[in-house]
Each structure stands twice: as C-alpha cells, then as structure tokens.
A protein has these predicted regions:
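Short, flexible loop segments at the rims of nucleotide/cofactor-binding pockets, characterized by
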Residues: 26, 53-58, 85-89, 159-163, ...
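Active-site metal-binding loops of divalent metal-dependent hydrolases
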Residues: 50-55, 81-83, 114-116, 140-141, ...
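Binuclear metal-dependent hydrolase catalytic cores centered on His/Asp/Glu-rich metal-binding motifs
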Residues: 127, 131-134, 146-187, 193-194, ...
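Conserved beta-sheet core of the metallophosphoesterase superfamily
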Residues: 190-270
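Beta-strand-turn-beta hairpins that frame and shape the catalytic cleft
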Residues: 35-48, 141-155, 178-182, 240-247, ...
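Short, Asp-centered acidic motifs that coordinate Mg2+ and/or phosphate
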Residues: 75-76, 109, 134-135, 151, ...
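N-terminal membrane-anchoring alpha-helices
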Residues: 1-41
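Membrane-embedded segments
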Residues: 43-137
Length: 277
C-alpha cells in the first residue's frame, strides 16, 4: 500500500468516524410511539408522556417541544418527574412555562422526580406547578375522562419522599383501582419494578434513566443509569412486567443539563395509544 493510499484511507476513516459521531450526538427531538390493546376502552385514547425535562431549552418559549406535542394530538399529557432541576443554571421558570403552556391545551398530570426534592423546595415546586394548571399527584388516584373513556391514573412521589411514605402512597393508589377501569401508575423510577408488579396496574409510566445516556442501537440499550448502574435493564422502551402489566420508560428530554452528552440517544416525547382489543 502506497503512502498516498494510506493517507487517503486514514482520511476516509476519520471522516466516517466524524460523521458517525455527529449522528450519535444528534440532540433533536424524536417521537417514540407505542400501542397497548385493552378490553377496558371502546375507543382509542392517546397519551403524551414527558419526563426529565430538567428545565432544558427547546426553542423560544419552548416552541420546538410544544409543537411536537401538538402534532401528536394527545388526549392527555402525563409528566413523570424531573421537570425542574436543582441546578441554578437551569431556569425553573422555563420548566414552569412549559407546563403552563401544555395545561392551556390538554389535561396535565404530574408526579415528582428526585430533582424536585433536591431543590430543597419540593412543596413549593408542587404548588407552582398546580398554579400553572397541572394536577399534581402525591399518592393520589384520579378518575380521568379522555376521548370519552374513563381511565384511573394513580401517581406517586419519587422515593426521595421517604421509603415509608413512598410505600404508603403506592398502597393507596393500588387500592383505588376497581379492576374494571384501565389503570395507570405514574412514577419516576423504573428500577422499582418489583414494587409495581402484581398490583393490577395495566400500565406503569416512568423516566429517570435518561436512556442509559449512551446507546449502541441493536447492541446495548443504555450504558449507565441512576440507581441501576452499568447496562441498565430499564433504560428506555417497553417492558412486560407480567400479570397484564406493561411498563413504558421514557428516555426523557434532558440535554444541556447533563454532564455527559447523550450518544445515539435522542431526547424523546413518548406517545402511547390505548386501543380497543
């Protein structure tokens, strides 16, 4: 192989590596769509699930994010925690404005994540979100009508609330189910699956894992996630927990708030269609 050929090959490999890296660092929003069939609904219901915003920016007035949600025409918007951030560099008002804009169009239901607790002002954050139109669930269950269908949405705080309180909240929302209405558990933590199984929920929605931060599609679903460590089992996607319970874990919306950039792991809006079986 001549020196010129070696140089050409090296340049080609470097260019290919650069293109691959740029593709991997793509931080544009993506929509992940899932569908669940149920005998408990007679017409489709569409949910938009947003997690782990961490007060990140999505255009002026959060237009990029809001437009993506609007195009999906959801019946409900569900927020699974870490919408605000404890880092003072991430403006809380941006997160609050996002929730307010969502609540002006759709019913919005919210539970806390660990970062709301890490602000040291979790009760104030809850009240600020209520003032912006979100229904804040802290161990409570609500019968919600959407697209002419009744759903039961139970929401629990992040375990940062304290383990005893967290378990009491979980027991409360479990007991609120009637066995006939499609039931959803809103939680922040996907790794607590053993606590969610066998409770009769049709659907568990969670975030927190940020998609494992780095992904290699087709090889690893995530490199590392909080409270799961290396190669997390519940980094993002759909999971069958058995007993008729499905879990959807959103890879979340965090971008500039993270210390390590996402790799092959675009921030996402989850759209879930509940369809008549």
């Amino acid at each position: 192989m001549t020196q010129k050929t070696k140089r050409t090959l090296a340049l080609g490999l470097a260019a290919a590596a650069g293109v691959t890296l740029l593709a991997g660092l793509d931080a544009r929003l993506v929509v992940r769509t899932y569908a669940i069939e149920s005998e408990q609904v007679s017409t489709p219901v569409r949910l938009a699930v947003l997690t782990d915003l961490h007060a990140c920016a999505y255009g002026e007035g959060q237009k990029n994010l809001l437009d993506v949600v609007a195009v999906q025409s959801p019946d409900l918007v569900l927020l699974c925690g870490d919408i605000v951030d404890d880092d003072p560099r991430m403006p809380e008002e941006r997160a609050l404005a996002t929730v307010e804009a969502l609540a002006e169009v759709w019913p919005v239901y919210y539970v806390t994540g660990n970062h709301e607790f890490w602000t040291g002002r979790v009760e104030e954050v809850r009240e600020l979100l209520r003032a912006r139109g979100a229904v804040v669930l802290e161990g409570e269950s609500a019968a919600v009508t959407a697209a002419g269908q009744t759903l039961r949405i139970g929401g629990i705080d992040d375990p940062s609330v304290g383990e005893d309180i967290w378990r009491e909240q979980l027991e409360t929302v479990t007991a609120a189910q009637d066995g006939e209405t499609f039931s959803i558990l809103l939680t922040h933590r996907p790794e607590r699956v053993e606590d969610y199984t066998g409770r009769g929920f049709d659907l568990v929605l969670a975030g927190h894992a940020h998609g494992g931060q780095w992904r290699i599609p087709g090889l690893i679903n995530g490199l590392i996630a909080p409270n799961q460590g290396l190669f997390p089992q519940y980094a993002g996607g759909a999971y069958d927990l058995g007993g008729g319970t499905a879990m959807i874990v959103s890879r979340g919306l965090a971008r500039e708030s993270t210390q390590v950039p996402r790799l092959f792991n675009r921030p996402e809006v989850v759209v879930l269609d509940i369809l008549p079986s």
